[in-house]
C-alpha cells in the first residue's frame, strides 16, 4: 500500500479547501464579454442548462452593445409537439430574440455545426457568403421527422437538420428566434 507515501490517507492528505459557488451561464458569458470583445458567437457545451439559463444568456446577448449571436440546441423531444410551449425554442420565439438561433436535434451540439459553417465566412472575398438555409451540417445525423413535427418546429422558429425521402438532408429554415433569417443578422 503506497497511499501513505503519496500522502493519500486521511491523516496525511491535504485538508479540504472551501470552494466557491459555480457561476450561472449568464455570469459566464458576461465575464467573457468583459474580458474580451474578440468573439462573435457562443454556445454552451453543457447539456444540462435549464431553459431559464438559455433565456438569461439570450437576454444578455440581445442587450449587448456589441453584435453577437447565441446558439441553442434543443434536445427535448417535447419540442416536436406544437402544443408544448415550455421548451427553449418556444420561449425564445415568444421573446423574439433576434440574436439567438435555435435548432432541434438529438445531437446536443448540432447548432455548433451550423455556426461553424456560418462563422467561417470570409466577408472580404467575392461570392463567399452563404445562406444558412438548405446547408449540410457536418458531424450531425439528420432528424427523421413527420410533417406535423416539422411544422411544429417551424412554428416555434426552431431550425432542424432534416432528412428527406430523396436521400438528402438540409438545415431548415435558417431563422433566428426573432423575425429574421440568420443571414440578415450575421455579419
Task: Describe these PLM feature segments.
Residues 1-187:
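Surface-exposed assembly/interface segments
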Amino acid at each position: 500500500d503506497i497511499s501513505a507515501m503519496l500522502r493519500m490517507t486521511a491523516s496525511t492528505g491535504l485538508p479540504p479547501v472551501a470552494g466557491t459557488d459555480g457561476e450561472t451561464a449568464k455570469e459566464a458569458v458576461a465575464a467573457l464579454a468583459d474580458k474580451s470583445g474578440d468573439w462573435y458567437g457562443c454556445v454552451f457545451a453543457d447539456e444540462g442548462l435549464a431553459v431559464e439559463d438559455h433565456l438569461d444568456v439570450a437576454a444578455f446577448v440581445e442587450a449587448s452593445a456589441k453584435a453577437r449571436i447565441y446558439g441553442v440546441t434543443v434536445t427535448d423531444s417535447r419540442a416536436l409537439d406544437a402544443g408544448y410551449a415550455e421548451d427553449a425554442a418556444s420561449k425564445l420565439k415568444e421573446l423574439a430574440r433576434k440574436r439567438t438561433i435555435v435548432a432541434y436535434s438529438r445531437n446536443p451540439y448540432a447548432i455548433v455545426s451550423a455556426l461553424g459553417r456560418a462563422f467561417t465566412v470570409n466577408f472580404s472575398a467575392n461570392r463567399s457568403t452563404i445562406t444558412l438555409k438548405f446547408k449540410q451540417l457536418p458531424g450531425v445525423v439528420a432528424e427523421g421527422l413527420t410533417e406535423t413535427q416539422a411544422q411544429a418546429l417551424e412554428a416555434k422558429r426552431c431550425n432542424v437538420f432534416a432528412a428527406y425521402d430523396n436521400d438528402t438532408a438540409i438545415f431548415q429554415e435558417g431563422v433566428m428566434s426573432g423575425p429574421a433569417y440568420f443571414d440578415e443578422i450575421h455579419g
